[in-house]
A protein has these predicted regions:
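N-terminal hydrophobic targeting/anchoring segments and the immediately downstream early-domain regions
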Residues: 21-156
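Second-shell residues forming the walls of enzyme active-site clefts
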Residues: 75, 105, 116-131, 140, ...
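Active-site mouth loops of central-metabolism enzymes
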Residues: 82-91, 166-181, 277-291, 351-356
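Short, acidic/polar
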Residues: 88-99, 180-190, 288-295, 357-365
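Divalent metal-dependent hydrolysis catalytic cores, especially in the metallo-beta-lactamase
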Residues: 102-110, 197-205, 370, 374
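A substrate-binding/cap region within the structured catalytic cores of diverse enzymes
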Residues: 164-253
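Substrate-binding cleft of extracellular glycoside hydrolase catalytic domains
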Residues: 136-184
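Sec-dependent N-terminal signal peptides of Gram-positive bacterial secreted proteins and lipoproteins
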Residues: 2-25
């Protein structure tokens, strides 16, 4: 889930009134005084121009005011927790949410099943999410990867969705843009209705080669078409409406926003799977400008609230570090693409990160690089590592504050 100040000045001008400037009918003077002896009447002094009224103070943005109030009331531990999108543990999930103050939880297929491996009923799943929200001091971001096709978590549960969501390529082949828009609205309605408020989609990677690792998850067309796809999905995903029947039989119409996460910046290209190891992308910066950035730019302009940064090493931006841990890559995201929302790492447990940082320090490096949130299954040790980094002077608390502002702004 991305602030206008109005200024107005009033300028008052005083007209200088000069007597005797108008032309009148000539009159015979009663007496003409001698030269040099006449009393010359001085024109009246002009009244001073009034000072312009001062410009009124801009009205404070209620959302920014609320965010600053929340931030001011948080301890360092609470602020550090907000930086984490925690993969839900199998046991004591509510306790972890409460004790670690995490900003969000990310659900996988297992989280839609009970202990016996059976799909949860809608009622049971909603109760599960409500319990997590009740445990959180600050409302939780509840996320899922519901791309459709090969990556579909929630829609595999037949108690939550009428059918599994299809891939963007399948949808476009069926009914082009109409099917893409209908699917986005359908997914949002059902995700929101059961308590999920963030979808880690759409995939904004440009891939036209079926041999690419990311191809089956991507739109599968060129950069311009992929940009149009991303824009279409984000615009249709901005709101979702559904009708709720209350216990007393009354009907309420609800319209909610769902958070969209564009991925995987700066663009996956034809790189290998970074779940198991490093991928090095040696393409030129010009190719990214002309191709890979287009879908991300389209999604940002359409209002996407978050961008997920990959673990690829992109040599034209940073030849040493994975994009997720690279300040240079985040600078491109902020300055070249003008993104002001929440930057999120890909999962820190993935193999591509392991050789660059130990478990705890990876989160610190991610925040130092410019991420606002990190995805992890080890929030306990990593939250503490952020607290320790601030206490030790490695990480400025102001950097944590700025990240938390973005996270809270996305929530509210």
């Amino acid at each position: 889930m991305r602030h206008l100040w109005k200024t107005m000045g009033l300028l008052l001008l005083a007209a200088l009134l000069l007597g005797g400037c108008g032309r009148r009918e000539q009159e015979q003077p009663a007496e003409v005084p001698a030269a040099g002896t006449a009393d010359v009447e001085e024109p009246p002094e002009a009244a001073p121009a009034p000072e312009p009224d001062p410009a009124p103070e801009p009205e404070p943005d209620p959302r920014e005011t609320a965010v600053e109030a929340l931030l001011a009331g948080m301890s360092l531990e609470e602020k550090a927790g907000q930086l984490f999108f925690m993969k839900l543990p199998d046991v004591e999930a509510e306790e972890k949410v409460r004790d670690l103050h995490v900003g969000g939880v990310l659900l996988f297929t297992k989280d839609f099943k009970d202990a016996a491996g059976e799909w949860l009923s809608r009622e049971a799943f909603e109760e599960k999410i409500q319990a997590l929200q009740a445990a959180a001091g600050t409302p939780l971001l509840v996320g899922v990867d519901e791309e459709g096709g090969t990556v579909a978590r929630a829609s595999r549960n037949p108690n939550l969705f009428a059918e599994k969501c299809k891939s963007p390529q399948e949808l476009f082949a069926e009914n082009r843009w109409s099917a893409i828009g209908d699917d986005a609205a359908y997914k949002n309605r059902d995700l929101l209705s059961c308590g999920i408020n963030v979808n880690f989609a759409p995939v904004a990677d440009v891939s036209t080669d079926p041999e690419d690792f990311i191809y089956d998850r991507a739109f599968g067309q060129d950069a311009q078409a992929t940009a149009e796809y991303v824009r279409w999905v984000v615009e249709h995903a901005a709101t979702a409406a559904f009708r709720k029947v209350n216990e007393d039989g009354s009907i309420e119409d609800h319209v909610y926003r769902i958070g969209c996460v564009l991925k995987h910046f700066p663009g996956y290209g034809s790189n290998r799977d970074t779940h198991t190891g490093s991928a090095v992308d040696e393409r030129s910066y010009e190719e990214f400008l002309e191709k890979d950035f287009l879908p991300f730019r389209a999604g940002i302009e359409a209002g996407a609230g978050a961008v997920l940064v990959s673990h690829n090493i992109v040599t034209c931006m940073d030849g040493e570090l994975p994009a997720s841990l690279s300040p240079a890559v985040h600078q491109v995201l902020r300055e070249e693409l003008g993104f002001e929302g929440v930057a999120i790492t890909d999962d820190l447990a993935m193999g591509a990160v392991g050789s660059y940082a130990k478990e705890g320090s990876a989160a610190v490096l991610a925040v130092l690089a410019g991420n606002d949130m990190v995805i992890t299954g080890s929030a306990g040790s990593q939250v503490q590592s952020v607290v320790d980094a601030v206490a030790g002077g490695v990480l400025e608390e102001s950097a944590v504050d700025q990240a938390v502002r973005r996270v809270l702004g996305w929530k509210y």
